[in-house]
Amino acid sequence: MRLITAILQPAALYPVQVALARHGITGMTVSECSGYGRQNGHKEVYRGAELTIDFVGKARLELLVEDAEAAPVVDVIVEAARTGQVGDGKVWSTPVDEVVRIRTGERGGAAV
């Protein structure tokens, strides 16, 4: 099993979700996060002082797939999220030793 994690522009979340659904992915976990990198932040004025806000809002998407599906799923995410602009995000795959569905006790692929 592989854990696919993607940090995306929030606006890319829906197109990625639709593309993954077309690929047969039926579930994922999404959370809000923030970070900074090459995109840099933005400036705001607070009480007359100009502040640089380094952290930019992002969406974090996580899903479990069988080993053979990892590369195709990463490709689907990249194609759906890519705009060509700085800040499009990152996607990576990490190995998962074991998965257990808490409700039933199923393990491995059956738990996903």
Protein language model features and the residues they cover:
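Positively charged, small/polar-rich N-terminal and surface patches that mediate targeting and assembly
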Residues: 1-112
